[in-house]
């Protein structure tokens, strides 16, 4: 449990008003600074309050990080003299903690050598790295068509049951294998059941060990749907603080946020409780500032990088809603998961035509990679345009050129699938991590017609093109 700083003389106040998650505290002596953590006990538990406003007459308005039911007027509150401090370091791997750094996985206390404040400034311009580099994930469809920037921000869009969690776990696994990096997962305002499932799936698929310890690759920080808005508005910052520590140790860190919309939603609830006048669609007037302050901390420095994958819920599928629209401004790439692709049994169900990346630029990825990616997309686009004709008239009515394009597109679709390490438990087929050179070489051969003689089935759920050729031989022999 994080120790509280020893209260200073004159830094003990008393509760004067409790309205839901907002608690007013009067101090006689020195007032605590904005964003300082105050502590009191509530129903026998430690309750942390974060200072949000100075109201005058020695009263501060605070936001509770846990339920305020049971607080009474006149109750003593101590100023810790610092912002919320959370444990950071390798001891956090394989563990689940809450917004104030307390372990919630019933695996004993979380003791670390270092603690860090959740509010930090973004790295200065001098510390930031300006190089554009790809973070190779070993997932063909991502690396070829919508590559991730090292230290970039990626938006992950997808409905329920199309494989967001499996993709997230595979990314955690591959980054640990290929880059030796750790991952931090921040569960912001999502279902507790999903958080529980993710924890157990990580143990089953060897991403984490039970109770942490050697071999664990990810730290989990949860502030789920049932938490008060104060916790949901800050839990992403807690996760980010853990990730920043790993980055400053020279690591390439993956930072997952599920769901970034809930961060904004919690900020909106807190803003209303603090009495701020709402802005467009009822959101907080500080929406862009809140988002910017968090997103600017996610970056590459000269020592290491934080690459962030953020699941984004789009309310009522309205992309112009201020919450998703504000997050789009910060993204370098988007990975869109499609139900229609998942229905074909192609996993990962990434939509090759809808997913985008600013890294797909010949100046960054090189001329060959860019040309191959564009050819793959144009072949798939042509197939999409011909699907109506095929549905009405059948394949026989197509020209010879179109028939070849359709055959290649179907092979490309299947070759974009690949077996995942974390899904070995369910599929029985060993996972594949494909090098970028092999991915480019394989798809280059496909679009140039070098593999037109191989059957479609040979390309399904394989890693490199060599495996597809081997599979074709086995199919022919069968």
From Swiss-Prot:
SMART domains named in the record: AAA (SM00382)
Keyword annotations from UniProtKB, A to Z: ATP synthesis, ATP-binding, Cell inner membrane, Cell membrane, CF(1), Hydrogen ion transport, Ion transport, Membrane, Nucleotide-binding, Translocase, Transport
SUPFAM superfamilies the UniProt entry points to: C-terminal domain of alpha and beta subunits of F1 ATP synthase, N-terminal domain of alpha and beta subunits of F1 ATP synthase, P-loop containing nucleoside triphosphate hydrolases
Bilayer disposition of the protein: Peripheral membrane protein
Organism in which the protein naturally occurs: Rhizobium johnstonii (strain DSM 114642 / LMG 32736 / 3841)
Pfam families: ATP-synt_ab, ATP-synt_ab_N, ATP-synt_VA_C
Domain of life: Bacteria
Coiled-coil ranges from the UniProt annotation: none
Lineage of source species: Bacteria, Pseudomonadati, Pseudomonadota, Alphaproteobacteria, Hyphomicrobiales
Residues the record lists as binding ATP: 158-165
Function of the protein: Produces ATP from ADP in the presence of a proton gradient across the membrane. The catalytic sites are hosted primarily by the beta subunits.
Reactions the enzyme catalyzes: ATP + H2O + 4 H(+)(in) = ADP + phosphate + 5 H(+)(out)
Protein known as: ATP synthase subunit beta
Chief localisation class: membrane
GO cellular component terms given for this protein: plasma membrane; proton-transporting ATP synthase complex
One term of GO molecular function: ATP binding
EC number: 7.1.2.2
Quaternary structure and partners: F-type ATPases have 2 components, CF(1) - the catalytic core - and CF(0) - the membrane proton channel. CF(1) has five subunits: alpha(3), beta(3), gamma(1), delta(1), epsilon(1). CF(0) has three main subunits: a(1), b(2) and c(9-12). The alpha and beta chains form an alternating ring which encloses part of the gamma chain. CF(1) is attached to CF(0) by a central stalk formed by the gamma and epsilon chains, while a peripheral stalk is formed by the delta and b chains.
Family: Belongs to the ATPase alpha/beta chains family.
Compartments (UniProt record): Cell inner membrane
